Swiss-Prot record:
Disulfide-bond pairs as recorded: C87-C90
Residue stretches spanning the membrane: 185-205, 210-230, 271-291, 301-321
Protein name (Swiss-Prot/TrEMBL): Dolichyl-diphosphooligosaccharide--protein glycosyltransferase subunit MAGT1
Function: Accessory component of the STT3B-containing form of the N-oligosaccharyl transferase (OST) complex which catalyzes the transfer of a high mannose oligosaccharide from a lipid-linked oligosaccharide donor to an asparagine residue within an Asn-X-Ser/Thr consensus motif in nascent polypeptide chains. Involved in N-glycosylation of STT3B-dependent substrates. Specifically required for the glycosylation of a subset of acceptor sites that are near cysteine residues; in this function seems to act redundantly with TUSC3.
Lineage: Eukaryota, Metazoa, Chordata, Craniata, Vertebrata
Self-association and partners: Accessory component of the STT3B-containing form of the oligosaccharyltransferase (OST) complex. OST exists in two different complex forms which contain common core subunits RPN1, RPN2, OST48, OST4, DAD1 and TMEM258, either STT3A or STT3B as catalytic subunits, and form-specific accessory subunits. OST can form stable complexes with the Sec61 complex or with both the Sec61 and TRAP complexes. The association of TUSC3 or MAGT1 with the STT3B-containing complex seems to be mutually exclusvice.
Pathway: Protein modification; protein glycosylation
GO cellular component: endoplasmic reticulum; oligosaccharyltransferase complex; oligosaccharyltransferase complex B; plasma membrane
C-alpha cells in the first residue's frame, strides 16, 4: 500500500517541478517583449517630438511598423515627393497629412496610441515592393495587432485627401478623434461681396433703363452655365475634395479619368463640362438652323456643324461612361 502512494507523490512532485521550470522561460520571454515594446514607443515618441510625421525607410518600417509587439497604431502615407516624380497630388496630400499630424501632436489629447509616418518611394522602394504597392499617395493604418484589413486602406479617390476626411477615417479605424481647426477663409465672402457690389453698381448706373434685367438671352446663358457646372460634378468636388489627376509613380502615366463609378478627378469634371458644352452648342446650332431667316447655304452649314458637334461630343461622353461603368454594353462611334 505504501509503494503506490510513494509513487504518486514522486509523480506529483515531478509534474509541479516541470510546470515551474516551464514558467521561467515564458516569464522571461514576456519581460523581453515588454522591454522591446517600451523601446519602440520611446523611439517613436522621440522622433514625433522632433517631427510630427516620421520619415521612414525599410530599416525603420519593418521593426517599428510591421514587427510585433505593438500596442499602437501607425498611420503611414506612401508617397513620391521627389521633383523628378512630378506627382502634384502627392505634394497636396502631404500638406494635408502634415496639417493633420501637427494638430494631433500639439493637441491636449495627444498620446502614444497613434503615430504618423511616411515612406517616400525613393527612400523606401523596398517597402513598396514588400506591400505590392504601385500607386501613390496611399494611406494605410497599421493596427496594434494583426495585419491591416481592407478598410485600413484609405479610399483616396472617394474621400479626397483633406485633413478633415483623413481624421474621420482615423476615428473610424482607431477611435482616436483628431480635431482639425482651420483659420476662416474670407476669400469666398469677399468674392461674393465684390460680385454683389458690381451687380449693384450696374443696376444703379442703368437705373433709368432696367430692360437688361429682362433679357432672356442673358438669363438663359447664366442658367446654362449653372446647369453645366452642376451636371459635370462640381458640387461633388466641393464636398469630397478629390485630386486633380493621378500619376503612377512607376510609369509616370497620368490618369485624368477615374476608373470607378464611385469617384472622379477634378480634371474629369472639366472634361465632362466641355463635352456637355459641345453637345449643347450643337443643339443650339440645330435649333438656329431650323428657325433662322438666313439663306439656305448658311443654314445648311449650321445644321452640318450642329450634327457634327452632337455626334462627336456625345460619342466621347459615352466612351467615358463605358470606361467607368464596365458592364455598360452600348457605344457610339468610339468604344
Amino acid at each position: 500500500m505504501a509503494s503506490p502512494r510513494w509513487l504518486w507523490c514522486v509523480c506529483a512532485t515531478a509534474a509541479v517541478t516541470l510546470l515551474l521550470v516551464s514558467k521561467v522561460p515564458s516569464a522571461s520571454a514576456q519581460r523581453k517583449k515588454e522591454k522591446v515594446l517600451v523601446e519602440k514607443v520611446i523611439q517613436l515618441m522621440e522622433w514625433t517630438n522632433q517631427r510630427p510625421v516620421i520619415r521612414m525607410n525599410g530599416d525603420k518600417f519593418r521593426p517599428l511598423v510591421k514587427a510585433p509587439p505593438r500596442n499602437y497604431s501607425v498611420i503611414v502615407m506612401f508617397t513620391a515627393l521627389q521633383l523628378h516624380r512630378q506627382c502634384v497630388v502627392c505634394k497636396q496630400a502631404d500638406e494635408e497629412f502634415q496639417i493633420l499630424a501637427n494638430f494631433w501632436r500639439y493637441s491636449s489629447a495627444f498620446t502614444n496610441r497613434i503615430f504618423f509616418a511616411m515612406v517616400d518611394f525613393d527612400e523606401g522602394s523596398d517597402v513598396f515592393q514588400m506591400l505590392n504597392m504601385n500607386s501613390a499617395p496611399t494611406f494605410i493604418n497599421f493596427p496594434p495587432k494583426g495585419k491591416p484589413k481592407r478598410a485600413d486602406t484609405y479610399e483616396l479617390q472617394v474621400r479626397g485627401f483633406s485633413a478633415e476626411q483623413i481624421a474621420r477615417w482615423i476615428a473610424d479605424r482607431t477611435d482616436v478623434n483628431i480635431r482639425v481647426i482651420r483659420p476662416p477663409n474670407y476669400a469666398g465672402p469677399l468674392m461674393l461681396g465684390l460680385l454683389l457690389a458690381v451687380i449693384g453698381g450696374l443696376v444703379y448706373l442703368r437705373r433709368s433703363n432696367m430692360e437688361f434685367l429682362f433679357n432672356k438671352t442673358g438669363w438663359a446663358f447664366a442658367a446654362l452655365c449653372f446647369v453645366l457646372a452642376m451636371t459635370s460634378g462640381q458640387m461633388w468636388n466641393h464636398i469630397r475634395g478629390p485630386p486633380y489627376a493621378h500619376k503612377n509613380p512607376h510609369t509616370g502615366h497620368v490618369n485624368y479619368i477615374h476608373g470607378s463609378s464611385q469617384a472622379q478627378f477634378v480634371a474629369e469634371t472639366h472634361i465632362v463640362l466641355l463635352f456637355n458644352g459641345g453637345v449643347t452648342l450643337g443643339m443650339v446650332l440645330l435649333c438656329e438652323a431650323a428657325a433662322s431667316d438666313m439663306d439656305i447655304g448658311k443654314r445648311r452649314m449650321m445644321c452640318i456643324a450642329g450634327i457634327g458637334l452632337v455626334v462627336l461630343f456625345f460619342s466621347w461622353m459615352l466612351s467615358i461612361f463605358r470606361s467607368k461603368y464596365h458592364g455598360y454594353p452600348y457605344s457610339f462611334l468610339m468604344s
